[in-house]
A protein has these predicted regions:
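Central antiparallel beta-sheet cores of small beta-barrel/beta-sandwich binding domains
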Residues: 13-139
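Bacterial Sec-dependent N-terminal signal peptides
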Residues: 1-15
């Protein structure tokens, strides 16, 4: 049986998520280019497994601010085949337009001596439930 031991602390996780103030790059619906960045990331003092985030998504020039949570999932982390730390995420975009909605999915952080790898993936659903697309972005 393999046991995962993380060397990343909560403070380091917040810093990692900020990504040196650079945006993450990815795609939505496997075709539209997307940039995602965080304005702030902080540990919830009442729930030490939860990070509160504020940020933005930019899909081909259409920008939307969001707020949300990233929550450490110990069960998924324990079962991770590549020893990644797994978090559940939910980001709610501000606005009520057809192209505003919720990102829900997972963040995996894989430790490396060179550069820690952060990968976000899941599904974006608009508030009217008329559009639903897979997304991913990473550092």
């Amino acid at each position: 049986m393999m046991t995962f031991v993380s060397t990343i602390t909560n403070a380091q996780t917040s810093k990692l998520l900020m990504n040196d103030a650079k945006s993450y790059i990815g795609k939505i619906d496997d075709k539209a280019k997307m940039n995602v960045g965080f304005y702030s990331v902080f540990l919830d003092k009442d729930s030490p497994e939860t990070y509160k985030v504020n940020g933005y998504s930019d899909v081909e020039g259409t920008k939307a601010d969001f707020s949300g949570t990233i929550i450490f999932n110990s069960e998924k982390t324990k079962n991770s085949k590549d020893e990644s730390k797994i978090y559940d995420l939910k980001f709610s975009e501000k606005g009520t337009g057809k192209h505003n909605g919720i990102f829900s999915g997972e963040l995996s952080i894989r430790e490396s001596s060179d550069k820690n790898q952060l990968k976000f993936e899941g599904t974006w659903t608009n508030y009217g439930n008329t559009m639903k697309f897979p997304f991913y972005f990473n550092n």
